[in-house]
Amino acid sequence: MILINVKYKVRPEFVDTFRQEVAAFTDATRAEDGCLFFDWYRSTEEDDVYILVEGFKDDAAEAHVNSEHFKQACVDMPKLLVETPTIINTLIPGKTEWDEMAEFKVEN
């Protein structure tokens, strides 16, 4: 699995509508072969910060960055942002899904 976390600092005028602004990109990415998850989260400490958590099968990330919707997002997103996003990109060989946390269990 390729696990990617991207931190976006959003312009004040787009803070409340950011998810709608990126909805088409999000939907198109989630429909890609090899996309395991593509989930947005808003910081509870910084109102203008959104985190994108992405997971792709090992061979799917290249197709993602070469897709038309990714190329369009690279044109559209900068106008929504205060600064260039920061990213953590990690290859986890053999991984395809989330694991249960080992440190404790929730009994149902």
Identify the role of each PLM range.
Residues I2-K9, D39-V65:
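Short, well-ordered beta-strand segments in beta-rich or mixed alpha/beta enzyme
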Residues V10-V15:
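Short, surface-exposed ligand-recognition loops at beta-strand->loop->(often short) alpha-helix junctions
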